[in-house]
Amino acid sequence: MVCGGFTCSKNALCSLNVVYMLVGLLLIVVAAWGKGFGIVSSIHIIGGVIAVGFFLQLIAIVGLIGAVHHHQVMLFFYMVILFVVFLFQFGVSCSCLAMNQGQQEKLLESSWKIMSNDTRISLEKKLDCCGLFNSTNLQADIMSDLHLCTSPCTQKKECVTCGLKMLQHSSEALKILGGVGLFFSFTEILGVWLAMRYRNQKDPRANPSAFL
C-alpha cells in the first residue's frame, strides 16, 4: 500500500523529524567525544559540528509543529531551511570523507600552532605523548615541546609524538562524521519532498469548502 494519504504523510513527516532530532543529538555527542579524547583539537571544528547538531534539532522542532498543525507558513520555511541545511551538510560531509592524511596533518599543525603552552601540556598528558610531529619544518617546535613536556612517558623515555596518536583517531572520527552526515543529508531531501507533498494535501478534518 502506497503512503499517499494525509494521515500517512503526516505520520511519516513527524517520524522523520524525530530522526532528525536524534541525528542532531548524535552529532553533538560524537563531537564532544572527539573533543574529550583529543581526537579533534580545533575548537572551530568542534563548535561547527555542535552548531549543526543544535540547528538540526531546532529545524526538527519547527517541522514537528508544522506537521502536527498542518501550518502552511511553518512548513514552507521548514522546506527552504532544510534544503539549505542539506547543501551545507552535504558539502561538509564530503570534505570530511575526502580529507587525506596530508590535509589532516596540515590541519593539526595549524591547530597546534595557535595552542598555548598550557593547552599543549594538558593534551600531552592526556594522550601520554610529546610534541606534534618530528619533522624538519617543525624542529624548533618539537624541541621546545620536548623541553616543556611532562607526560608520564618522559620517565620511560619512550614518547611518541601526539600527531601520530591523533592521526590514528582523526581518520576514524572524520569517517564517522562524514558518513553519518552524508547519509542523513539525503534524508533531508526526503524531508523536503514529504513536507512539500503534505503541505499541498487537504486536511480531511478542515472545512471542505476552505482553500488550502
UniProtKB/Swiss-Prot annotation:
One of its GO terms (cellular component) is membrane. InterPro entries: Tetraspanin/Peripherin, Tetraspanin_animals. Keywords: Glycoprotein, Membrane, Transmembrane, Transmembrane helix. The chain crosses the membrane at residues 13-33, 45-65, 73-93, 176-196. Its main location: membrane. Residues 1-12, 66-72, 197-212 are cytoplasmic. It is a multi-pass membrane protein. It is found in: Membrane. Residues 34-44, 94-175 are extracellular. Pfam families: Tetraspanin (PF00335). It comes from the Eukaryota. Glycans are attached at residues 117, 134. Belongs to the tetraspanin (TM4SF) family. This is Tetraspanin-31. It comes from Danio rerio (Zebrafish).
